[in-house]
Amino acid sequence: MTPLKPSDLVLTPTHLRFLGRRFPCARGRCGLTKAKREGDGATPRGVHRVVGMLYRPDRVAPPANWAVPIGPSDLWSDDPGHEDYNQMVRAPYPHGHERLRRADPLYDLVLITDWNWPRAVRGHGSAIFVHQWRKPRHPTEGCVALRRDHLHWIAERLTPGARLVVR
């Protein structure tokens, strides 16, 4: 692996490090794994790239000029048996998915990683995002989650392709 840079998002057991700052965070309820599987509740180890940023335009301003608004019909396919697995799709969509436009604020701002993307291996996990946490350090289904203001601070300074390092 190439040496770490201050612009890398580095996940440690207790925090996420970025630009010399440490942010408390949450990770998968089942810890970290090198062998990620759909629904296992683990955060995949490795070096991932941030390949997209989504935001709810009815709730927050775009934090960066490359952020894309989440529309009412936007979904993320989590059906390993379908060709759109681990891709953003639109309703109506009859296969397994999760809504990106949620009633709660968890996906008001989302950083999309390249875990198992763009050519997904079926069953190897989907929707590995960096998003707002439910409550302090409350485990996720495999994503990395942060306090709302910390997530926005990071998003305002992040560049496309930044690395998320999970060790």
Where are these regions (language model features)?
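Cell wall/extracellular polymer interaction/catalysis modules
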Residues: 1-140, 149-163, 167
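A conserved hydrophobic position in a structured secondary element of the catalytic/binding core
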Residues: 146
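Short cysteine clusters
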Residues: 143
